[in-house]
């Protein structure tokens, strides 16, 4: 499977270089060779592939910024700084969502174009090198997108896990007690940090700690907003992940077809060798039969001819 993908990407690079060379060298009234015609058919496909790659690169950059923002947020305590950071994070996530939807639309359009090429183009029938190249590249793009999905999912899980640890530390700082899991879950799920922590502070006779409580509330709002956006992004990726598996199965089928074709060719070569051996054997027995026939003729005709001469 990996070899097939590697060969397909090599074909992509080679075909694209050849296509650009043909386009630069070709002019009015100049007929391009057959390979150039094939590359011309792939020109739009290559351009679409590059556009998807650029969108993915932008998403990777946004992911790096989100990871950096998550680390930066650990050292921030002022509400204004936390809100500013939350604004940057939300802007990046909104941009990623927009790009992810655009990528999904582009990949769906590529799927439709691939299907149309199989129906309408004789050189792009199912299983042909051109069709395998288009299918493999489209599936490879989805595989990259799936890897990005896993990275964003890991970020979401890390943000919520770190937020949970922050709530636990702040609760311990205020009350001097390690909170039970149920208390932490209530603070996280219901967003009742101010009410719960104020009650805990009053119970233990500690002073006003509204700044800390407000910080936890701000972190809760930020974590919830980020989680909601990342879940929405995850759903977009998840919709495409189903197609990734389908494309993977198609590539496995293509690889099996290629292996089957190789087996058929090898089997055909064996049959040809057997046919040649059978032909040589038939000729040998034919020669032996002719020799035996000649000997029989000599053994029968010569005595008869001799007896006629004597009589």
Swiss-Prot record:
Membrane spanning residue stretches: 285-305
Topological type in the membrane: Single-pass type IV membrane protein
This protein's record includes keyword Membrane: yes
SMART domains: SynN, t_SNARE
Tissue specificity as recorded in UniProt: Expressed in roots and panicles.
GO annotation (BP), single: exocytosis
Limits of the t-SNARE coiled-coil homology domain: 213-275
GO molecular function: SNAP receptor activity; SNARE binding
Superkingdom of origin: Eukaryota
Entry keyword Cytoplasm: yes
Any one of the GO CC terms: endomembrane system
Cytoplasmic face residues: 1-284
Subcellular localization, as worded in the UniProt entry: Cell membrane; Cytoplasm
InterPro entries, sorted: SNARE, Syntaxin, Syntaxin/epimorphin_CS, Syntaxin_N, T_SNARE_dom
UniProt keyword annotations, A-Z: Cell membrane, Cytoplasm, Membrane, Protein transport, Transmembrane, Transmembrane helix, Transport
Topological domain ranges for the Vesicular compartment: 306-311
Function: Vesicle trafficking protein that functions in the secretory pathway.
Family of the protein in this entry: Belongs to the syntaxin family.
Name of the protein in question: Syntaxin-111
Organism from which the protein derives: Oryza sativa subsp. japonica
């Amino acid at each position: 499977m990996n070899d097939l993908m590697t060969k397909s990407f090599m074909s992509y690079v080679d075909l694209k270089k050849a296509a650009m060379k043909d386009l630069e060298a070709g002019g009015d009234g100049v007929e391009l060779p057959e390979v150039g015609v094939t590359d011309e058919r792939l020109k739009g496909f290559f351009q679409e592939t590059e556009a998807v790659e650029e969108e993915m690169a932008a998403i990777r950059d946004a992911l790096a910024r989100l990871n950096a923002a998550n680390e930066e947020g650990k050292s921030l305590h002022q509400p204004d700084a936390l809100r500013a950071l939350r604004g940057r994070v939300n802007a990046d996530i909104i941009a990623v969502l927009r790009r992810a939807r655009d990528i999904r639309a582009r990949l769906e359009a590529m799927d439709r174009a691939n299907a149309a090429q199989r129906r309408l183009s004789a050189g792009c029938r199912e299983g042909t090198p051109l069709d395998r190249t288009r299918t493999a590249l489209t599936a490879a793009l989805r595989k990259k997108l799936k890897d990005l999905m896993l990275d964003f999912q890991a970020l979401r899980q890390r943000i919520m896990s770190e937020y949970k640890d922050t709530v636990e530390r702040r609760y311990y700082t205020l009350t001097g007690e390690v909170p039970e899991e149920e208390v932490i879950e209530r603070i996280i799920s219901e967003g009742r940090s101010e009410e719960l922590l104020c009650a805990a502070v009053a119970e233990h006779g500690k002073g006003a700690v509204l700044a800390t409580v407000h910080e936890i509330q701000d972190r809760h709002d930020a974590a919830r907003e980020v989680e909601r956006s990342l879940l929405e992004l995850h759903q977009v990726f998840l919709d495409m992940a189903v197609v990734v598996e389908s494309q993977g199965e198609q590539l496995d089928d293509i690889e099996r077809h290629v292996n089957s074709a190789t087996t058929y060719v090898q089997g055909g070569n064996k049959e040809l060798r057997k046919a040649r051996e059978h032909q040589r054997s038939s000729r040998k027995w034919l020669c032996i039969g002719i020799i035996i026939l000649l000997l029989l003729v000599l053994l029968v005709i010569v005595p008869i001819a001799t007896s006629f001469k004597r009589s």
